[in-house]
Amino acid sequence: MLKYLVALISMVLAVWTVPEWLTFPIYGNVVTVLESWLRQRVSEVSASSPGLLLTKEQLSLYNGGKNSKGLYLAILGQVFDVEKGRKHYGPGGGYHFFTGKDASRAFITGDFTEAGLSNDVSDFSESQIVALYDWLSFYQRDYTPVGKLIGRFYTETGQPTDALLHVEAFLSDGLKKKAQAQSEMQLYPSCNSEWSEASGGRVWCSTMSGGIHRDWVGVPRMLFTPGSGHSRCVCIRLSDPVHSENRNLREYTDCPPRAESCQIAKD
């Protein structure tokens, strides 16, 4: 339990330690997933009973088939009653292969073969773990939790295993990086772009370029990723002093510094 609480505290600290220059509003699912995850973790720590504790064999009896006990699925060891979605999860439904088991891996890989319908996510990247918790958040929101699956993620007493703590550590790092990336997109929205064989390419800024709605247009700049040599076109606000300190920003060749559009010559 102590390790579990330490993991929870580490998760909160990781998200709160975003660099000051990236302290912008975070949009998308990241906040929703984080809040849902924290509520679930706190609930698990304080709950006196973990609900049903099912073995793999017991869970297999809830596949919606003949003589089935019900319609359950598990994701990251958490078991949900998906009876209200029988149209999709029951026999003949498009997601029936998820029922009666924990097929966490397939939610991300899309591999619905017998081998792919596994709960082994030990080789997942941080971004894949974040995406998987998006799915967990969906089931927590839309379906009824009924208990835990004994095995990879939960012990016979319903406590999280080291494997689950490892996954949650990856979630912590992944959420932090996603928050930083989304904050950077607010500070450096992507440019609009077009290309033609005849005239080459053009990049330009608008109040909606990069999908970021704002009250300023900006001017195009190349933003390089340190150590990679790769860049993307971003729109910057010249009046914002933070840009003058960023050595990874460069102007486009033969483009006036205050131009909202830059022509890119063909190679």
UniProtKB/Swiss-Prot annotation:
Q: Which UniProt keywords apply?
A: Neurogenesis, Secreted, Signal
The main location class comes to secreted
In this record, what's one Pfam family?
A: Cyt-b5
Q: Which GO terms describe its biological process?
A: nervous system development
The record's subcellular location field reads: Secreted
Cite a GO CC annotation.
extracellular region
Q: Where is the signal peptide?
A: 1-17
Domain called Cytochrome b5 heme-binding: residue spans: 53-150
Q: Please verify whether the record's keywords include Phosphoprotein.
A: no
Gene3D superfamilies documented for this protein: Cytochrome b5-like heme/steroid binding domain (3.10.120.10)
Question: According to its UniProt record, which protein family does this protein belong to?
Answer: Belongs to the cytochrome b5 family. MAPR subfamily.
Function statement? Heme-binding protein which promotes neuronal but not astrocyte differentiation.
Its domain description in UniProt is:
The cytochrome b5 heme-binding domain was proven to bind heme, although it lacks the conserved iron-binding His residues at position 90 and 114.
Q: What is this protein called?
A: Neuferricin
Please tell me the species this chain comes from.
Danio rerio
